Design a protein with these regions (language model features):
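Immediate flanking context of iron-sulfur cluster ligation sites
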Residues: 133-149
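A compositional/structural signature for long, glycine/proline-rich flexible linkers
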Residues: 1-100, 109-112, 118-125, 150, ...
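A short, structured loop/turn motif at beta-sheet edges
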Residues: 126-134
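Polybasic, lysine-enriched low-complexity intrinsically disordered terminal tails
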Residues: 185-231
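Poly-acidic low-complexity segments
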Residues: 3, 137-139, 220
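Mixed-charge, glycine-accented linear interaction segment located at domain edges/termini
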Residues: 143, 155-157
Length: 231
């Protein structure tokens, strides 16, 4: 194995420990039994690509639908442009808003969504750069917490972030008898439209887990960091 692959395996092992034992793990907080580790595609460096950001100036407010048919308020920063297996791809880059740090996130779907990976989509997180150059490492793509339990509210990718190619890299679908990998309610919400025109609900931004979680387990947008209470 390469040093890169070794490092990634260490990150994944740390994330499994976090998911197994930490109070802010969705499996611990939602009391989901039977966790035996997350599932991943084989590590493949072809899905570690360079991208350039085509900025939207000024950034625009955007509303992403959530698994509870709500909306998450984001700032749309621009489009990341890159190549995968000879195909030009574009993904919208989002930020949670002013005063929320320098981390941005990219929700996306691809040709594996709904089969080998979580149907409503996966996430990448990025640290913002000054030169608008980014590395997109899809081997580090991960599921939102709502992939494991409906105790969490998570934004879905907009229609513009549906990639035209399969990306068999990163985290695969989680599934057990009580938490199917592709919840039908989530898929109905996704099909109703990715990006909304007007806000109806702005989910409460919860406290970050960055201080407590290992690096491999931190990669979550802030709107999905903690479950909201059911009414």
């Amino acid at each position: 194995m390469t040093e890169y692959a070794d490092d990634l395996e260490v990150e994944r092992s740390m994330k499994d420990r976090f998911m197994t034992h930490h109070a802010e793990s969705p499996f611990v907080s939602a009391r989901i039994d039977g966790f035996h580790g997350l599932r991943y595609f084989p590590i493949d460096e072809r899905y570690r690509v360079e991208a350039r950001l085509e900025r939207v100036d000024p950034p625009r407010e955007s509303y992403l639908r959530t698994n509870r048919d709500g909306q998450a308020t984001m700032r749309y920063l621009g489009d990341l442009v890159f190549m995968i297996n000879g195909v030009e791809c574009r993904l919208r880059l989002f930020h949670a808003g002013e005063g929320v740090g320098t981390s941005a996130f990219v929700p996306f779907r691809d040709g594996t969504s709904g089969t080998e990976s979580y149907g409503p989509g996966r996430y990448l997180t990025l640290d913002l750069t000054e030169d608008d150059r980014y590395e997109l490492d899809f081997n580090r793509s991960f599921n939102p917490y709502c992939a494991y339990t409906d105790a969490y509210e998570c934004p879905f990718p907009p229609a513009e972030n549906d990639l035209p190619v399969p990306v068999p890299a990163g985290e695969q679908a989680w599934s057990d008898d009580r938490n199917p990998a592709t919840p039908q309610t989530a898929m109905r919400t996704l099909r109703s439209g990715g990006t909304a025109a007007k806000p109806k609900v702005t989910p409460r931004k919860s406290a970050s887990t960055r201080a407590a979680a290992p690096r491999a387990a931190r990669r979550r947008p802030r709107v999905a960091a903690r479950p909201s209470r059911k009414r």
